Amino acid sequence: MVTTPDGSPVAMVHCNNCTSDLNAWVGLFKQYQELLGVPVDMNEVFSKLYNHALKGDADCGGLIAYNYISGEPVTGLAEGRPMFVRSANDHFNLANFMRANLYASVAVLKIGNDVLFKNEKVQVDRITGHGGLFKTKGVGQRILAAAINSPISVMETAGEGGAWGIALLAGYLVNNDEKLSLADYLDKKVFAGNTGVEIAPTAEDVAGFDKYIVTYKAGLAIEQAAVANKK
């Protein structure tokens, strides 16, 4: 059993991939700008593309992406092949392309959390996001809120990335002279009344992501075929 340092049980959804494949796609747009002789500011490139994704269809127009640089146990893949898939009649444009890849970055997380929230009836007070996905203000937060149908809070330093959660647990063990419980340590020492900025999911986004994930799950056979046939 996985527990916190103070012995509380942990329900954990482990994902091997997040934004590595998405970053590779953004890198192509960087190369295109360089071909045009346009000075490249990567913060601007990410901001423009991420915010443009929010103009896409809530279900990404039928487009799906698999960000599987490596395998994903949650979906039964021991290996992965990054892949973008569309049908000829899907709504293919830049906004939907970017949105599909943003959805892909948290799709496995959604599948795992759906088991916890919908099947196991796990309830949470709030979810705090941290990592590079949240560096572009509001976008990753909105995508994750739609994925797990829950308000998402981010702190001011959310975009810095790193193993934030495990660092907090280490801090609890090393810097807890008052011998507080983990819950009290988080409330009094880490958040100290500052729960960050919260974004709640919209009904349209949630319905769109749910539709996307149905197509995503159906297409896992394509990912399996790629693993079997592309070395």
Predicted features, each with a name:
Residues M1-T128, L133-K231:
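Active-site core segments that coordinate phosphate-bearing ligands/cofactors
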